[in-house]
């Protein structure tokens, strides 16, 4: 699996005002989740020279290597996340250099997980992946969160676009929350928005997260799972979902099992009630939850 996303340093302030510094971003949450499934992980990422040796050692000890050429002059991407009772505020503190087409050349993988955190995957890089995928028929999963984010030049506070005219040609699967789904579909939501991405954009697997539900649309089947968990920190849950879904589908070629493993991984992570990367769940706990959801998942033939 190759993951395109910047590694980030997160400063997470919880409801009580406590601040936790943690490595983060899809590269870390998704990469470490994929390692739990026994997958080889290649990160297409960049960090700054401020990225500490202990962080490099931590990733290496968990089977993920940061190569020398991935360390650049720009600072490592950093966010401050403030978690309140009813909402979360995100601020960009520093941003690393964008990824380039040269960064993805000579990478051999059966799955691309494209999940920018703040526009570091330009349109030409995404197009190059899709073009390469057309030749090899690999799996391309997209999480559009980084394309949605707009940074206030004065405060660094991040807001979201209302409209995202993103070319989804060649994308195999997409994960989108309520705001992302509306931006990608011209304001549509729920099942209607998912069907639009499938029929009009050609996305084979559409995953939607809204409130405490995870939905999957594949062909004419709509599946949904309820996650009713109160947690102090859900940072990285979407990244864990995307990676677990990809791993399970690549291994089993069964979308039903894949969404059960995705939801199972999210539940296992949130049940730890830990912050940052400490919430990465074990494979055994993921499997336990996946088997439970396989027997309780709701579905509808459209």
Where are these predicted regions, by residue range?
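Conserved N-terminal subdomain of the carbohydrate kinase-like
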Residues: 9-21, 36-116, 120, 125-139, ...
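Alpha-helix C-terminal capping segments
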Residues: 31-40, 248-251
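Conserved post-catalytic alpha-helical subdomain immediately downstream of the catalytic base
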Residues: 202, 227-299
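Short, hydrophobic/glycine-enriched beta-strand segments
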Residues: 1-8, 141
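Short, conserved phosphate/pyrophosphate- and ester-handling motifs at nucleotide-, phospho-/glycolipid
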Residues: 34, 177, 238
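Short catalytic helix/loop segments, enriched in acidic residues and glycine
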Residues: 18-32
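Conserved phosphate/ATP/ADP-binding segment of small-molecule kinases
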Residues: 146-225
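Short internal beta-strands
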Residues: 42-47, 141-145, 174-178
């Amino acid at each position: 699996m190759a993951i395109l996303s910047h590694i980030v340093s997160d400063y997470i302030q919880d409801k009580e005002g406590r601040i936790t510094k943690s490595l983060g971003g899809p590269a870390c949450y998704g990469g470490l989740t994929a390692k739990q499934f026994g997958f080889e992980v290649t990160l297409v990422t960049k960090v700054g020279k401020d990225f500490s040796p202990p962080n490099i050692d931590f990733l290496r000890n968990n089977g993920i290597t940061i190569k020398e050429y991935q360390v650049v002059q720009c600072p490592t991407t950093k966010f401050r996340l403030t978690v309140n009772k009813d909402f979360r505020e995100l601020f960009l503190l520093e941003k690393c250099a964008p990824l380039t087409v040269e960064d993805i050349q000579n990478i051999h993988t059966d799955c691309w997980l494209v999940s920018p955190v703040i526009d570091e995957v330009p349109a030409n890089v995404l197009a190059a992946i899709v073009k390469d995928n057309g030749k090899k028929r690999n799996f391309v999963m997209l999480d559009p969160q980084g394309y949605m984010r707009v940074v206030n030049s004065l405060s660094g506070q991040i807001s979201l676009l209302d409209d995202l005219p993103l070319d989804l040609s060649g994308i195999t699967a997409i994960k989108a929350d309520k705001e992302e789904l509306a931006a990608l579909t011209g304001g549509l939501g729920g099942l209607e928005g998912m069907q639009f991405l499938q029929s009009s954009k050609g996305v084979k697997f559409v995953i939607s997260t809204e409130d405490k539900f995870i939905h999957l649309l594949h062909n004419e089947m709509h599946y949904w799972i309820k996650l009713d968990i109160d947690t102090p920190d859900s940072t990285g849950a979407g990244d864990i979902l995307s990676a677990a879904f990809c791993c399970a589908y690549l291994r089993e070629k069964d979308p039903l099992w894949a969404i059960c493993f995705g939801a199972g991984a999210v539940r296992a992570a949130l049940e730890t009630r830990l912050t940052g990367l400490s919430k990465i769940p074990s494979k055994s706990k993921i499997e336990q939850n996946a088997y439970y959801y396989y027997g309780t998942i709701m579905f509808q033939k459209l």
